[in-house]
Amino acid sequence: MGASIALELSKNGRKVVVIDKGGAPGAGSTSASSAIIRFTYSNFNTILMAWEAAQYWYNWSDFVGVEDPDGMAKFVKTGYLVFLTEGYDGVRQRELWDQFGIPYEVLSPEEVRKRWPAFETGKFYPPKSIEDPAFADDPYDQLSALFDPLSGFMDDPMLAAHNLAHAAKSHGAEFFFHKEVSGITKSGDRVTGVTLASGESISAPIVINAAGPHAAKINRLAGVYDEMKVHHQPLRQEVFSPPAPVGFRLEDNAPIVADLDLGQYFRPHMGDLLNVGTTEPACDPLHFIEDADDWNDQVTVEFFERVMLRLARRLPDFGIPLKLLGIGALYDVTDDWIPLYDKSSLNGFFMACGTSGNQFKNAPLVGKFMRILIEAQEQGIDHDVTPLEFVGEATGKAINLGAFSRLRSEAVTAGNVMG
């Protein structure tokens, strides 16, 4: 997010300084992202945002505008399959996709198996703990699915962040790594800059919080956290990269899969691997973190076994590996799993946070959102009173930025990483 914002603002003539505690662009949560580009969200604004952002990923080099000597991230088109199960029938999704011109198919269980024979299309709902005696029960019905052919993933999310940062630098942006913000300076009701743990101070009339899992801490330093109606905090997650079974590799045209029936998502990856995570089913405990600098970034046997055994139910030929292959990472999760792209009660202090593990795909638009929020405040427009809109280039339809306000009522969403 920070690199996207830096590019948009520097490209529009602003002097931009990026402070990052990490060692490189995208070295934090971005590097652990599954980097999925999909349109399966819960409401008008979030689906429209994802569809508009996808157009930039499809033409990534054109969007970035500057060739990165380290290489350019690439979009891998796989399509996206969502099994239709309890609590998700896809009807609202299809209505909105029809409005935006997003193509899709509804596939019967037989059609799913014909296209991808690796699947078991049986229904296991609800998702269960592996300690539950019913976990091994046979499926009791069959699942149809919703498939869109235009989704996919970026092959290297950290490289994508590097591409954005490199382009921002070409427009004059400066990046400082291994630097930690320890304070937000103010004069009255206006931000004046930041102080660093090293003792340095940086003066700035505009400060944007895009600190990922550290963002709640920064909002507290600014004194704006308590006035927010929607809050956010770090959530620990694990994502695994086991070998893919024969029949479900990139060469087999395997899709990205949202399996809410078992509480997981997975996709094919390069090197005959899978990328597997969870959709936070009710049977799984959530591990919120108090301090984003003090947590276990190693995968755990408990999490690994749970995810692998569920995956084997959907892909019967999947061989559960003996070695723990994966990473621990942090989401910055809001109360409703919808992000915060907003101003604050402190003039000049803005936030692009609460990305909830599902916003990598929208990074190309976030810089544009923040630019118009800043410009509106400079023009005396109160976004809290008169919510701004962003008109998408692809559809000509308006995204209501009030949907991402810190003062919104909690949105009705999937209540998990699906958003």
What residues fall within each predicted segment?
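Active-site substrate-recognition segment that forms the wall
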Residues: 7-11, 15, 35-37, 59, ...
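Dinucleotide-binding Rossmann-like beta1-alpha1 core, especially the glycine-rich loop
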Residues: 35-132, 263-264
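Mid-domain beta-loop-alpha active-site segment that forms a flexible
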Residues: 146-166, 212-214, 261, 299-310, ...
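Glycine-rich FAD pyrophosphate-binding loop
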Residues: 10-30
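FAD-binding beta-loop-beta segment adjacent to the flavin cofactor pocket
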Residues: 119-138, 317-365
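Flavin (FAD/FMN) cofactor-binding and adjacent substrate-gating region
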Residues: 86-171, 176-177, 183-190
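C-terminal lid/capping helical subdomain adjacent to the catalytic/cofactor pocket in oxidative enzymes
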Residues: 12, 106, 345-419
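Hydrophobic/small residue at the entry helix of a nucleotide-binding pocket
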Residues: 1-2
